[in-house]
Amino acid sequence: MLIDAHNHPNWHGFNAEKILRNMDEQGIDQMWLFSWEVPEDEYAPSYHAVLPPTGLGIPLEDVISVGRQAPDRFVMGYMPHPKRPDAIDRLKAAVEIHGIRLASELKVRLSFDDPDALRLYEFCGEQKLPITIHLDYPIDHGK
């Protein structure tokens, strides 16, 4: 089985139909779909070249919308920002209500050992949710 273990809904305009077609063309059996919850002060406007300009990052709603169109092919991921006071409650609800199976993607300007992050990681461990962490470096986002 070939798994694409890092992807996002609506990235470069790829909706469910385009993603599934691309998966079939490339022989990909399953894809992990990630949200990206990002504070406004961490979001570069250049991301609007590759994401819909309707908001910031990739909301859980987009993951659910695409993921539910082919639940046998998409594994849905969500990771709230660890500094949100309700981060654990939000992740727990996403798991219980929407079937989230991954804690993904953590891409924030925060130390790995931040106390709020550690609490969230501990919850993920208790829930047996794999965590993906995006390490970033300066790249051209298509300015």
Task: Give a label for each model feature.
Residues M1-E61, K92:
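An N-terminally biased module of ancient metal coordination in phosphate/nucleic-acid-related enzymes
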Residues S46-K143:
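Active-site gating/metal-coordination segments in enzymes
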